[in-house]
Amino acid sequence: MRILLIGLLFISSLLSLQAQPKEEIRATWLTTLGGMDWPTRKANSAKGIEAQKNELIRQLDALKAANFNTVLFQTRLRGDVIYPSAIETFAESLTGHTGKNPGYDPLQFAIEECHKRGLELHAWLVCIPIGNKRQVTLLGKNCVVKKQPALCKQFNGSWYLDPGNPGTADYLSRIAKEITSRYDIDGIHLDYIRYPEQGEKFPDKDTYRKYGKKQELKQWRRDNITRIVARIYAEVKQLKPWVKVSSSPIGKF
């Protein structure tokens, strides 16, 4: 009986070890919207560029010292980005001016500095929100609201991509593919991949009539989000199977 008990405990221990993940993800978001985490200095000169770079280096050193191993680096903010893109324009937070080239590639620099420290970099993409009236005005002709207005809806004072329009999956997957194909990222992280708060009033009746196929509205909306995520996942994995795809969901939406 004692031998049997020891044997069962041994098997239980083995099963417990097998259930443990091979690698624990210890991640943090690094927010670039409004320079909330970075950058606090604008890249309007060689000195400003150097200050931006040094500030990021200090933050990454601190994360490494705190035993983090993954940085979720905000790469798409509100209809703008922090790398030279053929799809969207440079974010205001880099230089203080929307669309202005900062004189270097912040995403490439962040990837290189993360990898020097053994940190993974996952490109964090804010998916559905585009921005409020001021942000959209600053983006001007480069904004998706101007370039592809059929994809966009105004709701509660802000603009959003319409998840029910199949073109939204096309648009977001293009951004994810552009980043994945051009950069040595370790992951794509999807944020705000959902309808906005109070989304039951989202103005998508026309889209629902066109694409709903007599499906119940709430289920149709859930399926729209699932299709976008599945599309991005499949196309990222087709380009680079080792790149991880994750999201920041909120259960009540």
Regions found by a protein language model. Name each.
Residues 69, 117, 140, 145-253:
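Polysaccharide-binding and catalytic clefts of secreted carbohydrate-active enzymes
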Residues 1-21:
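Bacterial Sec-dependent N-terminal signal peptides
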Residues 30-35, 76-78, 126-128, 192-195, ...:
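Active-site beta-loop-alpha junctions enriched in small/polar residues
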Residues 23-25, 31, 35-53, 123, ...:
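Active-site-adjacent "subsite" loops/lids of carbohydrate-active enzymes
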Residues 54-80, 183-185:
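Catalytic domains of carbohydrate-active enzymes, especially glycoside hydrolases
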Residues 73-126, 217-232, 236:
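Aromatic-lined substrate-binding rim segments of carbohydrate-active enzymes
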